[in-house]
From Swiss-Prot:
Biological process, per Gene Ontology: SRP-dependent cotranslational protein targeting to membrane
Sequence similarity: Belongs to the SRP68 family.
Location(s) in or outside the cell: Cytoplasm; Nucleus, Nucleolus; Endoplasmic reticulum
Record text about domains: The N-terminus is required for RNA-binding.
Oligomeric form and interacting partners: Heterodimer with srpa-72. Srpa-68/srpa-72 heterodimer formation is stabilized by the presence of 7SL RNA. Component of a signal recognition particle (SRP) complex that consists of a 7SL RNA molecule of 300 nucleotides and six protein subunits: srpa-72, srpa-68, SRP54, F37F2.2/SRP19, F25G6.8/SRP14 and ZK512.4/SRP9. Within the SRP complex, interacts (via C-terminus) with srpa-72 (via N-terminus).
Biological source species: Caenorhabditis elegans
Database matches in InterPro entries: SRP68, SRP68-RBD, SRP68_N_sf
Region spans: Disordered: 576-622
Protein name (database record): Signal recognition particle subunit SRP68
The keyword Transport appears for this protein: no
Alphabetized Gene3D superfamilies for the sequence: Signal recognition particle, SRP68 subunit, RNA-binding domain
Known role: Component of the signal recognition particle (SRP) complex, a ribonucleoprotein complex that mediates the cotranslational targeting of secretory and membrane proteins to the endoplasmic reticulum (ER). The SRP complex interacts with the signal sequence in nascent secretory and membrane proteins and directs them to the membrane of the ER. The SRP complex targets the ribosome-nascent chain complex to the SRP receptor (SR), which is anchored in the ER, where SR compaction and GTPase rearrangement drive cotranslational protein translocation into the ER.
Amino acid sequence: MTNDVEMKSETEELPPFPTVHILQVVKDAQQQHGLRHGDYARYRKYCAAKLERMRKALKFTNSHNCQKKRKAKFVKKWLSVESVQNVQFLNFGIFESERRYAEAMIDKITLEDNPEKSRKKFSMINSLRKAVLHATNLEKIVQESERFDAPTKLEAQAYAAWMRGMCSFESRNWQKASESLKLAKTVYEKLAEATNNTTLSSIFKGRCREIQPQLRLCEFNIAESPGAVGTMTELMELRMQMGEGGDSSVDKLISEMRASATSAEVVTIEWGGAKSTVDDEKAKQVVQEWKQTEVELAQCQTPKEKMALFEKATADTRDAIDRISDIIRRKSSENADTTVLQSIKAYLEFLKMNGTASRYLAIIDNTKSEKKSKPQDLLRLYDSVIEIYKEVAEIPGADHDKNLIQAFEVKVEYYRAFRCFYMASSYSALHKYSEAAALFDRTVSRVQDAEGKLKKLKSSSFITNETQSSLNELRSEVESAKVTVRAARLASAAGDVKTDSELAKIIDKRPLLETVNEWRQWDVRNSLKDKKTIPVASLPPAFIPMPNKPIFFDLANFHLTMPNVDDRLEKLQKDRDATPKKAAKGSSAAAASSKTSNQEEEEQQGLTGMLSGWKKSFWGNK
């Protein structure tokens, strides 16, 4: 009894742990170690290295069970309530779970890039199950220990529920995923309301926003029919909320719904003056997708959402065109009729071109909304739009529809006015005011032409984005720009505005030694204020090319023929014979001279042989 009383008193005397904000620990680690850019591999390595460091520092290492005549068996040391001596021990459960979650996301990304690697799906599910195991163990330890406060227990419960929900979500167990995600969202919402810390509140609310799209997708799949919870429009909104890095299951569900919708009905198109029935399932889905895209565009709030819609639709259209081309090639080899298929292919080409041009227009709207947009950027985009609309008339069968040809001629003239305006703005930015004024005048004439053609085809179904109000706005912008250009021209003529050459003189940083023959202006006072020195010479001096000695020095000198001096030698010999003393002296001198001449000949032959050897080694024997 006394021992029990002593143990109880010891446990009661243990101080409580401070509050552990699990989600904040996770978010800080993710933002600092790879997940800011979606690099799960880097994050996994960080979690593994941190676990190894903590096990060594806290002396909580794993062990190996050694047995005779057998390989040592790895025994993992699990976290328990008794082993938690301080708050740092909770990091074992957190980062073990995060490491497994990062491994699962790596497998998921690999599976999305390579759908044929089906084994990666099993690896992903296994990693998520291990992550759930560690998160559940963490929750159990925190709940059973009396040293942790209520916020820590709630965070552990929410984290484990979120991890279970993600595992069920990837396993397509929609019911369990919905229950777990709802629990996690409820707990995080309560924590956000209870805390006074704005940083923690924003983190909790951010996790709730992350859970919401996945929760809606679970509810959508749980319903017996899609209409019970939401329609196709709701699914598209859900995909926009999840963004580009969202789950691929939304796209799969959308394609499945479109496939089921198109398989039951007959899809007909009108192209080249004739109606054709689309039998291919992929082409059916693409035609229905473009119809649905027109409805979804009205719900888009930003140009980026429109860009994503057009990009997805054009990619699917390219795949359908490739499929139809393969069918045409196969039937042509069998001498079968391909007229209907050619018409369908031409119609898909028209959809692709029109969608690509619309995507460029969405990019233009997005570029205009940015602060650092330049007229040159918009000029290139308008060039692309005009070229695409010109190519529409060259599609086979397009000449049978006069309304289509006239409508796209109006489109070309309409966007030429905008291109001319931004070309004039580009010249104005380069201080070429005369050219800019002429182009602004041409813009006015193009606007008038576009207005006249637009009024004639106002009721055409092909003209949707081109409006009279946009032309009126362009006209007002042109008028204000013309006034600005005229004022700039007058200022430059009066000398108030510095030309490019004058600016170049001030900005010129060449040293004075290189510009001795030039007259240069230099503002000495401002240079002294800015502590700028006048460059006199560039140090160190630049390298200049210099001629070097050739590898074969003077080979031509060895081929010179010297004059014959035998007659002089005979005369010299006779003189020596006539005078004995002089001859003796002369003979010794001659012997010395002959000896030196022989040495010179030997040295000359040795040098010639060496150089001839070099010559043979470079060019070979002739």
